[in-house]
């Protein structure tokens, strides 16, 4: 009994000692981060300078962008958002300084590496363009870029049009029983369309979402996996939580994501076995793999197929949902767009890319939607190089994380007049006088520099075709339950969106 008491006293003493050490360490880190840290000259809330907890809390709640907007409104162009992370909204200078090509004043500087917290290698161990180092990224981009050139997109248009026609016909079918009127969830319909398009371009066959009018199981896995990214981020910044990882991460979801990559690899092999020359991604990737010394391994092709499937679908669908909502909340803009589209095309069959590419108001509407509701709304962190770097006139020491907070930059009056108004006219060439001082280069929704989005041409093509055919075919009205749709969207690195209930009425000609 005495031995037990002695051991109990020892255990209590050790536990108490550990608690005291933890409190002392926490106190030391708090004083250091607030008073002596190398980022102490960067403005921001005191609590953000000493702890990751506030930032992690917003990450878990899905309120990062709202918080970023508030911080920049209060503290200015540059804000310390965590003990080792700094956010910028001075996009005109910060984008080139952080993400740009190393030319001109930056000649001789290395590209800043990505914040490794956000870029975890696929389960097969082979990095895609997203995680690759500079050398491997350049090698992979030389191979993959052929699938996204303007010439390639022009050849892919008939395939894209096939699925857009399925979308329009499906919506007509969904409203047929009510004399051409009905209410649908456009978030689901846009997701089905963009995922079917990207799957056919990648694998030679769609997911079948538009055919089945349901979300394929691996599309559902992808959409759910966005929510787990925030948890991985928090676990990375609080290492002691990794011992409780199973309590925070749904291991079934982790396994499903591994199964998804395995399924993608199988689909890639099936597509390669067909040996067809249709103008899809795989034809162009395989035709150029090995040219000029740039060659991807089979596993790298699989990893990049997984990336393209994800990046080339959900973000496009997000923008389509957003622009639909914004048009319906801004009747003046909708009427002007409707007039341009319906006067330009006498028939549905005439709606083709060569003509769509000349339509200035359609283009301005999409640019304004990308500014107002960027599909990737957060900052993509980069690690400052050895010796430190000047970013937008501020010196940042090596090892700290820097980024441009996209949503906050695009909704700042420092960059745009009436930033919370949906005004496509700000993108007109020549500029509208009222918006002549807008810093349009502060908006880079497809990112910037050597790591800029590879699929920009395809995204613009899909957006133009889908939006034009929707506006030509239907009159749209926002249902009461979706009047606050945008405010109910949350950011889990990408947007997590609720139902967008829209009443459609087929246009009779």
Curated annotation (Swiss-Prot):
Chain segments annotated as transmembrane: 8-28
Family matches, as InterPro entries: Cyt_P450 (IPR001128), Cyt_P450_CS (IPR017972), Cyt_P450_E_grp-I (IPR002401), Cyt_P450_sf (IPR036396), Cytochrome_P450_monoxygenase (IPR050121)
A single GO molecular function term of this UniProt record: monooxygenase activity
Main location: membrane
Membrane topology, record value: Single-pass membrane protein
A GO biological process held by the record: mycotoxin biosynthetic process
Pathway field: Secondary metabolite biosynthesis
Keywords of the record: Heme, Iron, Membrane, Metal-binding, Monooxygenase, Oxidoreductase, Transmembrane, Transmembrane helix
One GO CC term, this protein: membrane
Named cofactor requirement(s): heme
EC number: 1.-.-.-
CDD domains assigned to the protein according to its UniProt record, in alphabetical order: CYP60B-like
Entry keyword Heme: yes
Localization: Membrane
Key word Metal-binding present: yes
Database matches in PROSITE patterns: CYTOCHROME_P450
Function: Cytochrome P450 monooxygenase; part of the tra gene cluster that produces terrestric acid. The clavatol biosynthesis cluster cla and the terrestric acid cluster tra are both involved in the production of peniphenones and penilactones. The non-reducing PKS claF is responsible for the formation of clavatol from successive condensations of 3 malonyl-CoA units, presumably with a simple acetyl-CoA starter unit, and 2 methylation steps. The esterase claE probably collaborates with claF by catalyzing the hydrolysis of ACP-bound acyl intermediates to free the ACP from stalled intermediates.
Family in the record: Belongs to the cytochrome P450 family.
Protein name: Cytochrome P450 monooxygenase traB
Gene that this sequence comes from: traB
